[in-house]
Structure formats: C-alpha cells, structure tokens
C-alpha cells in the first residue's frame, strides 16, 4: 500500500499543480478542447486544488499504511479512479472529445483502481491498526 500512496501522491500533486497553474494546457492535452468560459477555468482550478489535496493526503499517509485511515483513503481513491475512468470514457465515446493524454489517463486510472482493489484485498487479510 505504501507504494500506491507514494505513486498517487506524486501523480495527483503534479496534475493538481498543473491544473492550478496552466489549466488550459492540461485540458487541451487531456480532452483536446479549451476552457472557453471563465467558469470552466474556475472549475479546473478547484479540481487542481482537490487533486493537490489528495496528493498531500497520500503523501502523509504513506508511512501509516496499516491504519484504518489509510484503508479509508485507499477506498476513496478507488471511488475516484473508477469515477475518473467512467467520466473520461464518456468524454471520449459520448462527447467525441480526444486529446493526446485521454487514453493514457483512462488506462492510468484503471490501473490505479485495480491497484487500490489489490491493496484493500490484501489489507483485509491482515489486521488493521488504530491510531491513538
């Protein structure tokens, strides 16, 4: 689980910072579109802040991977990755959006979801610890 938390921390922190700093570039690479409305720019930056927060949470939990809190974080990451795959697939298939990073992002989120499942399954087999 520690490796999953470190990899997720690195990826989500980098993408979060990119969305905060250059959201139009990220969206162009991901979806092949632009952020035409100011509201879309705000939503992209809020998304960047959320991803940065996820990255920080994963980084801080990396040394406490046997705790219930870490298991809860990985469960939330599983939900996020499955939702990301679903939304990105809809963007491609339903909305005909395409950027150079779209399918790599789908595959990355799918792989991270499988990794989350594996970690949660393994965690189930071993006892969890509680802080305090």
Predicted ranges, named:
Residues 111-132:
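Membrane-water interface at the C-terminal end of transmembrane alpha helices
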Residues 1-12:
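Cytosolic juxtamembrane helix and N-cap/initiation of the first transmembrane helix
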């Amino acid at each position: 689980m520690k490796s999953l938390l470190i990899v997720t921390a690195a990826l989500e922190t980098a993408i979060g910072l990119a969305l905060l700093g250059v959201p139009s570039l990220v969206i162009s690479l991901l979806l092949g579109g632009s952020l035409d409305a100011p509201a879309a720019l705000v939503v992209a930056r809020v998304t960047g802040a959320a991803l940065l927060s996820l990255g920080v949470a994963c980084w801080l939990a990396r040394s406490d991977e046997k705790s219930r809190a870490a298991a809860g974080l990985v469960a939330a990451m599983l939900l996020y990755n499955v939702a990301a795959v679903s939304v990105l697939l809809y963007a491609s298939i339903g909305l005909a959006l395409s950027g150079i990073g779209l399918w790599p992002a789908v595959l990355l989120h799918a792989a991270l979801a499988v990794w989350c499942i594996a970690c949660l399954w393994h965690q189930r087999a071993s006892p969890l610890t509680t802080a305090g």
